[in-house]
Structures are given as structure tokens and as C-alpha cells.
């Protein structure tokens, strides 16, 4: 007889979204000029812990069998590390390099948005992040100040949406039911509202149980 052990954990997603919110607000304030250019290294140091926090969320999400959340949070972690290192060290050509990086991230985000719609919290954060990555990327390549300020304003919007998502998911995990609307649908809705049989469906085909990835 083969036994498969499942261990309940607290949802790591509130931590992930709160981290996105705080880091987005910090970088947005720098882009808007609320924080001056000489303070960019201090901003980079404030953003650097976001890498560790979101990397932790990614690991926990993999353990919770949520490949979409794990992939997104892991990639977000890498993006904060790249930003912090480039801005903190004042590397030559940093804005232009980060511009290309953000446009590449935009392509990744668009692909992920196509598969995350049932998970509305992730989807909404992605949807508001896409124009910010576009504006940040173009600002880095062109040096246009209005694009930088637009990206900064969008960063504050991302912070608001991510804060709502984090708070709603934290309340849900604490009370064991949806308190604030998140808008799950399809498999994501059934995973929360369904019984144990829904959670165990096709378990033998999941990574870590099947023979190969």
C-alpha cells in the first residue's frame, strides 16, 4: 500500500501580496519624484528584502501544489533582486538595462495573465502590473520623464490592489471562508468551496507523486 501524506499550511499568499504592495509603493515613489534620485540606493536596500520574502512564498506555494502562484512569486522575487542590485550598485546603463528587463517581464506577465484568470487575486495584480511594466520599460529605453511618472503612479495602483488581495486572503485563511470578495472561479473556486474529494482528484498524477516531472 502506498501512502501520500498531505500537510495543511497557512496560506503564504498574503505575505507575497503585501510584499508586492510595499515594494511597488517604494519604487513608485522614487519614479514619481517623491523620493529624490540620490535616495535610490536607500530605496534599493528597502526593496532587497522583498526578494527573500517572495522567494519564501514561492517555496511554500510549490509545497502547496500551486504551480501558478509559485512561479509568479518566484519570478517576482527575482525581479526585486535584479532591481535592488542594479539600483543599489549604480551599475552603468542601469535604467536602460532595467527597461529591457521590464519589457521582457511584460511578455512573461501577459502569458501568465492568460492562465491565472480563475485565481482572480493573482490575475488582478497581474493586470494592473502589466501597464506599469510597459511604462517602466519604455521609460528606461527612452528616458521620457512622463513615462517614468506614469509608471510611478501605476506602481501606487499596484500597491493598492495587492494590499486588498493580501488582506482579503488573510481574512479568508483566518476565518476559513471568504469574507471580502476575491472573485475565484472554476478550479480555484472548487478548491476552496469543494470537499476533500475535490482536493485529492488526480493526485496520483501530480508532481512529486508521479515518477517524473
For the regions a language model picked out, list residue spans one by one.
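Hydrophobic alpha-helical transmembrane segments and adjacent interfacial helices
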Residues: 24-31, 55-58, 78-90, 108-113, ...
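Early transmembrane hairpin module of multi-pass membrane proteins
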Residues: 37-74, 81
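Structural signature of hydrophobic alpha-helical transmembrane segments
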Residues: 36-51, 90-104, 125-126, 152-156
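Short, Lys/Arg-enriched, Gly/Pro-containing loop segments at transmembrane-helix junctions
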Residues: 174-183
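Membrane-helix interface "capping/anchor" motifs
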Residues: 60-70, 113-125
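Membrane-interface helix caps and helix-loop-helix hairpins in membrane proteins
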Residues: 88-95, 114-121, 142-146
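Alpha-helical membrane segments in multi-pass integral membrane proteins
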Residues: 100-111, 121-141, 147-168
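N-terminal topogenic module of multi-pass integral membrane proteins
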Residues: 1-55, 186-213
Amino acid at each position: 500500500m502506498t501512502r501520500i501524506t498531505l500537510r495543511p499550511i497557512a496560506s503564504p499568499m498574503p505575505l507575497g501580496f503585501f510584499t508586492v504592495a510595499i515594494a511597488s509603493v517604494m519604487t513608485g515613489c522614487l519614479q514619481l519624484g517623491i523620493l529624490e534620485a540620490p535616495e535610490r540606493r536607500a530605496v534599493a536596500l528597502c526593496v532587497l528584502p522583498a526578494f527573500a520574502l517572495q522567494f519564501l512564498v514561492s517555496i511554500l506555494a510549490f509545497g502547496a501544489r500551486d504551480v501558478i502562484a509559485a512561479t509568479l512569486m518566484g519570478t517576482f522575487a527575482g525581479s526585486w533582486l535584479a532591481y535592488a542590485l542594479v539600483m543599489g550598485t549604480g551599475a552603468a546603463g542601469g535604467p536602460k538595462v532595467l527597461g529591457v528587463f521590464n519589457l521582457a517581464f511584460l511578455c512573461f506577465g501577459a502569458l501568465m495573465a492568460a492562465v491565472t484568470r480563475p485565481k482572480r487575486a493573482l490575475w488582478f495584480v497581474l493586470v494592473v502590473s502589466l501597464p506599469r511594466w510597459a511604462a517602466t520599460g519604455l521609460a528606461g529605453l527612452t528616458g521620457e520623464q512622463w513615462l517614468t511618472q506614469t509608471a510611478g503612479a501605476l506602481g501606487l495602483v499596484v500597491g493598492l490592489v495587492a494590499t486588498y488581495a493580501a488582506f482579503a486572503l488573510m481574512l479568508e485563511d483566518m476565518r476559513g471562508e471568504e469574507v471580502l470578495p476575491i472573485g475565484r472561479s472554476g478550479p480555484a473556486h472548487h478548491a476552496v468551496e469543494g470537499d476533500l474529494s475535490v482536493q485529492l482528484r488526480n493526485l496520483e498524477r501530480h508532481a512529486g507523486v508521479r515518477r517524473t516531472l
